[in-house]
Amino acid sequence: MNAVLRVRISAKQSKQKVIITAASRVTHTDKFNICGREAKKDATTVLDCSVISAIAKKYAAKRIETDNKADAWWPQLHSFAVGLKGAPDLIKAREVAHHIGTVHHEINYTVQEGLDAVRDVIYFIETYDITTVRASTPMYLLARVIKSMGIKMVLSGEGADEVFGGYLYFHKAPTPQAFHEETVRKLSKLHLYDCLRANKSLAAWGVEGRVPFLDKEFLDVAMRINPAVKMCPGKEIEKKVVREAFADILPQSVAWRQKEQFSDGVGYSWIDTLKAVTAAAVSDEQMAHAAERFPIHTPQNKEEYYYRTIFEEHFPSESAARSVPSVPSVACSTAEALAWDASFQGKNDPSGRAVAGVHEEAYKD
């Protein structure tokens, strides 16, 4: 194992080194592998991506050929953020870009543009999972812009929430052991959800996404951290380990900002409109007979029914339907974590706003 990864991770400097080692390995490799095009930063969940951006910016400033001694006049690090106008993630991504000095690109999409893309998105991501469809659509639209600029690769902050328990429902974890076991479950299912979204939404336009937080050596260290240190009981901020390690190189408004899931952070009206449109498109009678039409993983609400209908048009086989996970979830939890809090019982809402008493409304549409 790299010597850097053997240090004690309780110290702030050591935490930084572990993450920087993972990110630098990716960014250094990229400068040789992307045929002269710049490495770019895709701003999804702002805190996680901001950490990777700051590290990438550090290494992009020097020439590898001179062992990082000479300044690099080219390429410049570009950053990207996508969302509806006024979305909370756009505002914070803009702050980070200004703070670390990237060439920033802010891509606005309209709700109608998102709705028009849903059918194609479901085809490319090959799932009808509600959260994945919601979040993949803006990422798909973002990837189109990135590709149009001739860019081949982006870095992303995927995996940090799974490793450090960043989702808001983790506030309800009853014990360190339960917290750790849930992070393991989340990591084991990433290929069905967030990594599927990031990979296939980008690959639909020929863009490669790389994820330093899922670097194997980094995971080997991060998953050995005492889960009691990662926990965020009550109103304590989530992912405190990461925030403390990088608070000095990020804007404070970002370093200590509450988690917003990507599908929320791009604009709350995106999810609310999807719910309204699908509720109007699927009748009560159709829902009443959902089990007859879809005996495998029967849709539990109209939004899921709508996506499932499109999915079946693209992939009509039973094996395709079975390949998609279908379990109840609150704020992207696993089914096992629903036992953590009485308010979770009977709920099936993947939005972070579903965690009562924890989520603080970031803005109003």
Question: Where are the regions a protein language model picked out?
Answer:
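ATP-dependent adenylate-handling active sites, centered on carboxylate activation for C-N bond formation
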Residues: 1-6, 10-11, 18-26, 30-250, ...
